[in-house]
């Protein structure tokens, strides 16, 4: 039962009754300041959008989540902050470049959303979303990705060898994220199930640095 909804109309055969377990955590996905404040006020965790930069995390996410938490008598540490990250990881430059190009396409795709344009503005690339949308309206998918220059891409992607990846992730997200999600790990695993063995020590290393 809540302020707006009363979920009580449930046939007996489908009702689980009382559950002898703690309430599951409720996370909220948020991008803009209002949603981030709301998440900080009421949620157990915040799922950050994949279109994120260190600047966005520090200047938009952290202060707004903290403000929302404070309004409810809580602190930022009462919430889990889950941050996805585009990684371009490989043993050589060619492998890294393949993932960088996939990241470029994803940044352009997400960056075409008007409400997300401020993320580019924060890092000095004003008008990026408008340029992406021009190419989008023309049906030029390659042109959309081309708007994301290497200088822009650097703000969104961690490029590393497997040996360096954990250190770079820790340096980027230390003091910001409670959990880091490797955005492309699933795609890598689907293409090559053996790649999972390479992600496991990276995850263990990052956790060990927390």
Segment roles from a protein language model:
Residues 1-210:
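Active-site-adjacent structural elements that line small-molecule/cofactor binding pockets in enzymes
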């Amino acid at each position: 039962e809540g302020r707006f909804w009363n979920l009580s109309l449930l046939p007996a055969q489908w009702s689980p009754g009382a559950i002898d377990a703690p309430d599951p955590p409720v996370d909220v996905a948020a991008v803009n300041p209002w949603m981030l404040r709301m998440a900080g006020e009421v949620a157990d965790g915040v799922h950050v959008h994949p279109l994120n930069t260190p600047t966005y995390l520090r200047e938009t996410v952290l202060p707004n989540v903290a403000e929302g938490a404070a309004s409810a008598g809580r602190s930022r540490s009462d919430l889990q902050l889950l941050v996805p990250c585009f990684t371009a990881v490989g043993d050589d430059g060619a492998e890294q470049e393949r993932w960088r190009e996939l990241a470029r396409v994803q940044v352009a795709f997400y960056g075409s959303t008007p409400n997300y344009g401020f993320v580019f503005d924060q890092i000095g690339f004003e008008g990026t979303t408008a340029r992406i949308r021009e190419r989008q309206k023309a049906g030029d998918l390659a042109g959309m990705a081309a708007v994301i220059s290497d200088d822009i891409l650097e703000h969104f992607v961690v490029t590393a060898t497997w040996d360096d990846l954990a250190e770079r992730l820790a340096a980027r997200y230390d003091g910001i994220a409670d959990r880091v999600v490797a955005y492309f790990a699933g795609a890598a695993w689907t293409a090559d199930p053996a790649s999972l063995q390479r992600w496991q020590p990276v995850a263990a290393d990052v956790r060990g640095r927390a």
